[in-house]
């Protein structure tokens, strides 16, 4: 899980979702998981 100021899609499998006001990226590749913080 990467914590970043700006979350971006890193590949075509990445999805940007909002979970209780936290922006997250979920992906098939676990190295691409991110959250904004």
Curated annotation (Swiss-Prot):
The keyword Coiled coil does not apply. One of its GO terms (molecular function) is structural constituent of ribosome. Pfam families: Ribosomal_L36. Belongs to the bacterial ribosomal protein bL36 family. This is Large ribosomal subunit protein bL36. GO terms for cellular component: cytoplasm; ribonucleoprotein complex; ribosome. SUPFAM superfamilies: Ribosomal protein L36. PROSITE patterns: RIBOSOMAL_L36. HAMAP family: Ribosomal_bL36. PANTHER family: 50S RIBOSOMAL PROTEIN L36, CHLOROPLASTIC, LARGE RIBOSOMAL SUBUNIT PROTEIN BL36C. Coiled coil: none annotated. GO terms for biological process: translation. InterPro entries: Ribosomal_bL36 (IPR000473), Ribosomal_bL36_sp (IPR035977). Keywords: Ribonucleoprotein, Ribosomal protein.
